[in-house]
């Protein structure tokens, strides 16, 4: 700037900006630390995390996406990896920790290449091609899954090490039965499986309800508590006199006029109840409120009614009973009613629930999940949700791969062969991608208290003979995972590798960070981050 000229501020003076290698280093560090945070939770021997929020509420879990969601991370690069975990959870239901640690390792390997002088664009291109090749290799080593026994193995593998160890066979049975029941034309909507978590009993008392359970009680205690041969009406709008859409004032000159108004309102309510009765309905689920007078008349007619039922529950009741949601009571007919063998109210532990059972071929069902304490029941629920996701994926795709780190080692082996066919610096990126994938078997070994280097060497040697060789973390041996029954959906691995590669590529392409306010990474903070392997003591990351 020439002498005497005033400086020009394009950005606010309190803005932080990091350019080039500095920006890349900060983002890579954030990704590495985040991956290190969840790494110890991977596998059957993984450890749990205790998360305590500002209100003192405690969550104890080893579920990757739950940990990341509860941590409330604000660092922009770290948030990208959190999104990877959330996408993995939404798409396939499991593999969240795997996806995050692969992404973190890809960034770690990329950092080495950048220090060697390889441009981030070349690394990103190599990663993209390696990810595509990995998908092809996964197809080659996949196995067909078509029977119930395979689905059971998939469910048990997903739940192993997630707090449900003692009852995993029982829970796997529930999951497989539930998923197969709600399947429609080869597709599974996981929302049609409702998990009702109730503490106060052994997990072995968990069961499937051939229908739906909702956490609602009768709208009035004078109504029947149990209805056999239930005929179900679903109403979208309230059973009450509608308010005027515009403000209006009415002048009354005689007390009898007031009485006439009251009688007219009562008659309208009676007509609504009569319409419900004439349709043949003996149970009503209303999405909105129900007038007290309407409750009185419904009770007098022996009709059970529940008000303010959640929209999601209404949808499941539709699927389970065949009922149709009616927007106007005047349009309600017998054809709109659903059927169930019995509907009853029951108190379990300290919760009052309504059971809709003995439905004819329900396409939405409930699982009653028991647990001795609140924290146990919550972790069981997370394990069950993971298992439902992987069984649904398997049933839809009918493709599985071996577990125990077998697919990662096989893909890494073949990627190194593929790298030898590539010229230029991109070859280094493909080889780095292969090295990064081996973080999965290494972590499984470390979490089991084994020597990761010895395990990895043995695995590489075993894969010269079979692509299904993985690590048995319970005895430390290298075994055929296919024969051991440790299998996972192909979709879980595909999604994890693809999402991790895309996130790493996106982070590597960032060469300029502009933070509006308060974002700063001092050298001291970086030393703290590198030395901790967790997220605490890290102001810029939280």
UniProtKB/Swiss-Prot annotation:
Keyword vocabulary terms for this entry: ATP-binding, Chaperone, Nucleotide-binding
| KW Nucleotide-binding (keyword) present | yes
GO molecular function of the protein, one example? Answer: unfolded protein binding
> Which Pfam families does the record match to this protein?
Cpn60_TCP1
Known InterPro entries for this protein?
Answer: Chaperone_TCP-1 (IPR017998), Chaperonin_TCP-1_CS (IPR002194), Cpn60/GroEL/TCP-1 (IPR002423), GroEL-like_apical_dom_sf (IPR027409), GROEL-like_equatorial_sf (IPR027413), TCP-1-like_intermed_sf (IPR027410), TCP-1_chaperonin (IPR053374), thermosome_alpha (IPR054827)
Name the protein family: Belongs to the TCP-1 chaperonin family.
NCBIfam families recorded for this chain? Answer: thermosome_alpha, thermosome_arch, thermosome_beta
Q: What name has this protein been given in UniProt?
A: Thermosome subunit alpha
């Amino acid at each position: 700037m020439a002498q005497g000229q005033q400086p020009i501020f394009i950005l606010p003076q309190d803005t932080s900006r990091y350019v080039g290698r500095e920006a890349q280093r900060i983002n890579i560090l954030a990704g590495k630390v985040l991956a290190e945070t969840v790494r110890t939770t991977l596998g059957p021997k993984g450890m749990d995390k205790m998360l305590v929020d500002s209100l003192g509420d405690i969550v104890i879990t080893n579920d990757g996406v739950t940990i990341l969601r509860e941590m409330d991370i604000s660092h922009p690069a770290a948030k990208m990896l959190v999104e990877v975990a959330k996408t993995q959870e939404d798409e396939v239901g499991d593999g969240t920790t795997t996806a995050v640690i692969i992404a973190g390792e890809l960034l770690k390997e990329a950092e080495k290449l950048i220090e060697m002088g390889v441009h981030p664009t070349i690394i990103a291109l190599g990663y993209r091609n390696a990810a595509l090749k990995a998908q092809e290799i996964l197809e080659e080593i996949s196995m067909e899954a078509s029977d119930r026994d395979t689905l059971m193995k998939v469910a048990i593998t997903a739940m192993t090490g997630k707090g449900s160890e003692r009852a995993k066979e029982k829970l796997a049975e529930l999951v497989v039965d539930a998923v197969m029941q709600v399947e429609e034309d080869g597709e599974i909507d996981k929302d049609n499986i409702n998990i009702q978590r109730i503490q106060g009993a052994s997990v072995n008392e968990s069961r499937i309800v051939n229908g739906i359970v909702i956490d609602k009680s009768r709208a009035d205690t004078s109504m029947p508590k149990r209805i056999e041969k239930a005929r179900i009406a679903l109403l979208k709008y309230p059973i009450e006199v509608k308010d005027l859409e515009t403000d209006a004032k009415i002048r009354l000159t005689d007390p009898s006029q007031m009485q006439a108004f009251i009688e007219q309102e009562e008659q309208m309510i009676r007509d609504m109840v009569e319409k419900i009765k004439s349709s043949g309905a003996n149970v009503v689920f209303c999405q909105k409120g129900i007038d007290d007078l309407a409750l009185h008349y419904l009770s007098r007619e022996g009709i059970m009614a529940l008000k303010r039922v959640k929209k999601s529950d209404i949808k499941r009741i539709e699927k389970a009973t065949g009922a149709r949601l009616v927007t106007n009571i005047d349009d309600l007919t017998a054809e709109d009613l659903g059927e169930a063998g019995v509907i009853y109210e029951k108190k379990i532990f300290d919760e009052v629930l309504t059971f809709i059972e003995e439905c004819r071929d329900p396409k939405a069902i409930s699982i009653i999940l028991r647990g001795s304490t609140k924290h146990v029941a919550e972790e069981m629920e997370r394990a069950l949700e993971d298992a439902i996701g992987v069984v649904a994926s398997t049933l839809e795709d009918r493709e599985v791969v071996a577990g125990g780190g077998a697919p990662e080692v096989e893909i890494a082996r073949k990627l190194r062969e593929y790298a030898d066919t590539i010229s230029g610096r991109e070859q280094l990126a493909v080889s780095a991608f292969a090295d990064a994938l081996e973080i999965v078997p290494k972590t499984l070994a470390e979490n089991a208290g084994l020597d990761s280097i010895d395990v990895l060497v043995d695995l590489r040697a075993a894969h010269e003979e079979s692509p299904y060789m993985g690590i048995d973390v319970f005895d430390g041996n290298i075994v055929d995972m296919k024969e051991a029954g440790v299998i996972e959906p192909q979709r879980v691995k595909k999604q994890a590798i693809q999402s991790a590669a895309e996130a790493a590529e996106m982070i590597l392409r960032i060469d300029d960070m502009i933070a509006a306010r308060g974002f700063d990474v001092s050298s001291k903070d970086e030393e703290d981050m590198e030395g901790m392997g967790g997220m605490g003591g890290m102001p810029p990351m939280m």
